A protein has these predicted regions:
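Intrinsically disordered, low-complexity segments enriched in small/polar residues
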Residues: 1-186
Length: 186
């Protein structure tokens, strides 16, 4: 697995945080995945921050909630995957009714991570999606008997400066002054 580093410099007179996020390759709009601030770090004027992460990808589920007017995601389970091999997993409940991933295997679309959402009911809202470097990048609402495919950008990220925390939902379509950073995978 590759590991990347990115240094961001705050050359402004503003206090805030740099946030890294991903934009899903398709399905924008209300039914598309929620983009999350996958990494975030505060930077005072005249300072710099460094991010580093692994390009390991995997499946993730948890809860999304609102606190202080911000929507954030808290992860409860992570399962490492490979978009070219073990890229299909089932999501449902165990014999006690607890939400869980199970049955990681080959068989999903090449280059994508696919979640088969089984027939299950939960007493609280479940969100599931994918992670990069074990941090969530996109999530969707759990929907019974739906197949969800996600394509991670392992070698690209979007950077924005403002008031962000890791796990916070970002409206990618509303962002301005965004920097897209591409990494050479070799």
């Amino acid at each position: 697995m590759s590991e990347y580093r990115l240094t961001c410099v705050n050359n402004s007179s503003l206090h805030g945080s740099f946030a890294l996020y991903q934009v899903p390759p398709s399905a924008p709009g209300p039914m598309g995945p929620a983009c999350l601030a996958w990494l975030a770090r505060p930077a005072a004027p005249g300072t710099q921050v460094r991010f580093s992460w692994s390009t390991e990808v995997g499946f993730i589920w948890g809860e999304r909630g609102t606190f202080g007017g911000r929507t954030t995601f808290t992860a409860y389970q992570y399962v490492a995957a490979d978009p070219e091999r073990e890229n299909l997993i089932d999501f449902g409940s165990d014999s006690f009714g607890a939400p869980t991933f199970q049955n990681l295997r080959t068989g999903g679309a090449q280059g994508a991570l696919t979640i088969r959402q089984l027939n299950a009911t939960f007493d609280f809202p479940i969100h599931l999606g994918i992670a990069l470097g074990k941090s969530p990048i996109y999530t969707v609402d759990f929907n019974v008997n739906v197949l969800g495919a996600f394509i991670p950008h392992r070698n690209r990220c979007w950077v924005v400066f403002g008031s962000y925390t890791a796990g916070e939902a970002i409206d990618a379509e509303a962002q301005t002054n965004v920097q897209v950073v591409d990494f050479n995978p070799s």
